[in-house]
Structures are given as C-alpha cells and as structure tokens.
C-alpha cells in the first residue's frame, strides 16, 4: 500500500498526515483478502454501506483506473471529496457524477431513470418513475436541450445545501 502519509502532498487531498494514517488502518481492515485494493464485496462489508443502493456508483467513481477495484490512492482521493475541509464545488461534482453514468458531462433522461430506479427499487412502477424523471428534466433543464448539465444541477442542488451533508469525519479517537 505504500507510505500513506505521502499521499497528502502527492495528491493534494484535504486530509492531514494523521487522518491519512487512520484512513490507511481503515483501508487495511476493509481489505479482507489483503490484495491492496477493495472490491465491491469488501466495501459492502461496512454496515453503513450495506443498505446504500448507490454504493456501486460510488465505487465506480472512486475507481479512476476502471479495474473494478479501489486501491489505496483511489480510496484517499475519493474519500477526500467528503472531507469537512473539502469545498462545495467538489462535493457537488461528485454528486453529479453519481447520475452522469456515461461521464459525458450531462444527466440524460435514461441516466436519471437508472439512478432513481436504484434508489426506489420496486416501490414505484416504471411508468410512475418515468413520469417523475420526465418532470424532473423539465424543471431542471433550463436551456431546453433535454438533459441536465452540471451547471443546471448545481444551481438547484446548491439551494438545498446538499454539499453540507456530503461529509465524512475521520475518527480522531484512540488507537485500536
């Protein structure tokens, strides 16, 4: 896994030396097969993630090299986006990327449907969900191109102060 402390300066994360060391210990605990990277199953071993329908999308975003697993560098960079010291724009971009599944800079009708389907499961019929998606696109799509840009997303979500809820705290408690 390398020297965890060097990641702060190398990658410009929002974590200090001690936080990176603590995250390194957490990463090692999660890395059940000791491969040096985290699979979806290893992420799902965390009770707080087991019920999160979007954990797969979060892993996709953390996994910048696209190999299906999250190594320590990807873990630190990804987690840093949720640091209390992280900025609003970074948090909003992360939230936008949850929906922008093809990473083209826009949320399409189909992408919004897929992500909302992950969240609601079978609680809504597909036609009901599609109505919700269509109405959402109509409201959010200010330029009328049929899709939601980051700017359109940001303008709406910023007023909800979602970025203040997208925070992770690194435990400063006693050593294990």
Curated annotation (Swiss-Prot):
Write out the residues that bind Ca(2+) 2.
Answer: 63, 65, 67, 69, 74
Which positions fall inside the EF-hand domain?
A: 18-53, 57-85, 87-122, 128-163
Q: Report residues binding Ca(2+) 3.
A: 100, 102, 104, 111
Ranges for the region named Calcineurin A binding are 131-136
GO cellular component, as recorded? calcineurin complex; cytosol; mitochondrion; sperm flagellum; sperm midpiece; sperm mitochondrial sheath
Q: Give the positions of the site Interaction with PxVP motif in substrates of the catalytic subunit.
A: 118, 122
Subunit structure comment from the entry: Forms a complex composed of a calmodulin-dependent catalytic subunit (also known as calcineurin A) and a regulatory Ca(2+)-binding subunit (also known as calcineurin B). There are three catalytic subunits, each encoded by a separate gene (PPP3CA, PPP3CB, and PPP3CC) and two regulatory subunits which are also encoded by separate genes (PPP3R1 and PPP3R2). Interacts with SPATA33 (via PQIIIT motif).
Other facts: This protein has four functional calcium-binding sites.
Q: What is this protein called?
A: Calcineurin subunit B type 2
Biological source species: Rattus norvegicus
What lineage is this protein's organism placed in?
Eukaryota, Metazoa, Chordata, Craniata, Vertebrata
């Amino acid at each position: 896994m390398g020297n965890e402390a060097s990641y702060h300066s190398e990658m410009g994360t929002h974590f200090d030396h001690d936080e990176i060391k603590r995250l390194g210990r957490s990463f090692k605990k999660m890395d059940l097969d000791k491969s040096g990277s985290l699979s979806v199953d290893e992420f799902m071993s965390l009770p707080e993630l087991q019920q999160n329908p979007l954990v797969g999308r979060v892993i996709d975003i953390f996994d910048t090299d696209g190999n299906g697993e999250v190594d320590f560098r990807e873990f630190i960079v990804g987690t840093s986006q949720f640091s209390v010291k992280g900025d609003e724009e970074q948090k909003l971009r992360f939230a936008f990327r949850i929906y922008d599944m093809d990473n083209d800079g826009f949320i399409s009708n189909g992408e919004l449907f897929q992500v909302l389907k992950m969240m609601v499961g079978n609680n809504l019929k597909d036609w009901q969900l599609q109505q919700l998606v269509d109405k959402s696109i109509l409201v959010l799509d200010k330029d009328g191109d049929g899709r939601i840009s980051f700017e359109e997303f940001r303008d709406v979500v910023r007023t909800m102060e979602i970025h203040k809820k997208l925070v992770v705290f690194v435990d400063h408690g006693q050593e294990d």
